[in-house]
Amino acid sequence: MKKYYYLIAATLMMGTMTFVSCNDDDNTPTEQTAVLDFENDKFTALIDNPQYNGPLLYQADSYQWEDNGNSNLSCSFSLNGSWGKGWFYGGIAISNYIDADETHNSFTYQLSVPKGNGSNNFAIVQAGSADNQAILKFSDSKAHVIKSMQVMNTTYALYASWGGIKQGLKDGYKFAVTVKADNGASKEIVLAENKTAIENWTNVDLSSLGAVKTLTFTFSGTDAGDYGLNTPAYVAIDNIVVVK
């Protein structure tokens, strides 16, 4: 009888221990993330028409957007500079233009991508030189980890009649955008290399950058001359995942 009693007691203790262990696992905090997908009416209202010389990117003094209360990412930039008023000086503009026509090979199609990713809106990063950069920043001034984002080459960058990626593809060719954080970390995203270019929306892991307050985009490539890159310095981005 004693043996039987001890057996029951031991079984109950093991069950209790197992229950507590499960409880500890359940209390492990789960990672919370926010996704900047540019998909509400506020972003749609910022899509310029026409794509070049439109009222939002060429006739205003500045352009800005923010995703407060969600990812808290934001971007603002001046449209005034030494070349006059317009989107010549770097920045990140909202778009929804899908255009795979290879004859649409000029800057008048600068807000287009050749294919969508299942949603309506995305953003176009443009940064023509080291002096004209595109900057993402957190509006709450706190450092956050950006886990990933999607990238895609634009219609203009791919098919441009002068300096287009498709024209340049060969052994030794390269076109890339580098994302640099305020903490000194950076990541090069290769958009085209040798005979291959990104022509589908592609997910890029940015977690190695660590916690950041700002991200700066700059472009580089092998097709360059005395005045910088010949390749149009554009890339499309979407679905930026931020750890809250």
Task: List each language-model region with its residue ranges.
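Bacterial Sec-dependent N-terminal signal peptides
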Residues: 4-6, 15-45, 244
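N-terminal targeting leaders for non-cytosolic proteins
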Residues: 29-131, 141
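Short aromatic-glycine motifs in intrinsically disordered, low-complexity regions
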Residues: 129-140, 228-231
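Short beta-strand/loop motifs in extracellular/secreted proteins, especially
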Residues: 134, 147, 173-177
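Extended extracellular/luminal ectodomain segments enriched in beta-structured repeat modules
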Residues: 141-148, 212
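Short glycine-rich beta-strand segments
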Residues: 151-154
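Short coil-to-beta strand junction motifs in C2/discoidin
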Residues: 160-177
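Terminal, low-complexity interaction segments
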Residues: 176-244
